[in-house]
């Protein structure tokens, strides 16, 4: 389940599992 900011994700990106990943293809990082 993906979550948005304010639902367990510290960044303004979708938070899938335990990782926050921006919607773009150039980034891939954890919270």
From Swiss-Prot:
Q: What is its main location?
A: secreted
Keyword Cytoplasm annotated: no
- Present the record's domain note: The presence of a 'disulfide through disulfide knot' structurally defines this protein as a knottin. The cysteine framework is VI/VII (C-C-CC-C-C).
List the source organism.
Conus cancellatus
Swiss-Prot/TrEMBL keywords: Disulfide bond, Gamma-carboxyglutamic acid, Ion channel impairing toxin, Knottin, Neurotoxin, Secreted, Toxin
- Recorded protein name is Gamma-conotoxin-like As7a
Domain of life from the UniProt record:
Eukaryota
Protein's job: Gamma-conotoxins may act on voltage-gated non-specific cation pacemaker channels (HCN). Elicits toxic effects in the freshwater snail Pomacea paludosa after intramuscular injection, but it has no effect when injected intracerebrally into mice.
The organs and tissues expressing this protein are described as: Expressed by the venom duct.
Q: List the disulfide bonds.
A: 2-16, 9-20, 15-31
Q: Which family does it belong to?
A: Belongs to the conotoxin O1 superfamily.
| Entry keyword annotation includes Disulfide bond | yes
**Stretches that traverse the bilayer:** none
Compartment(s): Secreted
What is one term from the GO cellular component aspect held by the record?
extracellular region
Provide the positions where the record notes the PTM 4-carboxyglutamate.
14
A GO molecular function held by the record? toxin activity
